[in-house]
Amino acid sequence: MGLPEDFITELQIPSYILKILYVIGFFRDIVDALCPYIGLPRFLDHNETSAPDLTRHALSTSASLANELIPVVRFSDLPTDPEDCCTVCLSDFESDDKVRQLPKCGHVFHHYCLDRWIVDYNKMKCPVCRHRFLPKEKYTQSDWGSGSDWFSDEVESTN
């Protein structure tokens, strides 16, 4: 009732495959590390991959729409008394901080926090309450994507 005699040799075949895969991965890492030295981009660095031109254009369009519709003002110039801290970075507002106040919900954020939310994370809704801060007509009039509004319709139907 013990193990079969050829059990050890059956286990050695997968270990050879694992060793081969390890060596291939090692050489891949070496080639990736040498790419910048020979003028090629690194192919394993996902943080530095460039977006396609369409995506880059879409991000710049959304950022310019945000600049147009949500102006930057000083925190001390706000007519109402909003929250004491930015809910994106959790830092307290100072009177001379440059902020953006969203028109629909009134939430206030540092301008760089909201800009990063828009551009880096591609979010077009308030970080706190998820209200769309770009009106749908502005969103669809802009060429903020491929021309179809399937994504926003999908999001609208889930809310």
Curated annotation (Swiss-Prot):
InterPro entries: Znf_RING, Znf_RING/FYVE/PHD. Probable E3 ubiquitin-protein ligase that may possess E3 ubiquitin ligase activity in vitro. It catalyses: S-ubiquitinyl-[E2 ubiquitin-conjugating enzyme]-L-cysteine + [acceptor protein]-L-lysine = [E2 ubiquitin-conjugating enzyme]-L-cysteine + N(6)-ubiquitinyl-[acceptor protein]-L-lysine. Predominantly expressed in stems. The keyword Phosphoprotein does not apply. PANTHER family: E3 UBIQUITIN-PROTEIN LIGASE RHA1A-RELATED (PTHR45969:SF12), RING ZINC FINGER PROTEIN-RELATED (PTHR45969). It comes from Arabidopsis thaliana (Mouse-ear cress). GO terms for molecular function: transferase activity; zinc ion binding. The gene is RHA1A. A zinc finger (RING-type) spans 86-130. One of its GO terms (biological process) is protein ubiquitination. This is Probable E3 ubiquitin-protein ligase RHA1A.
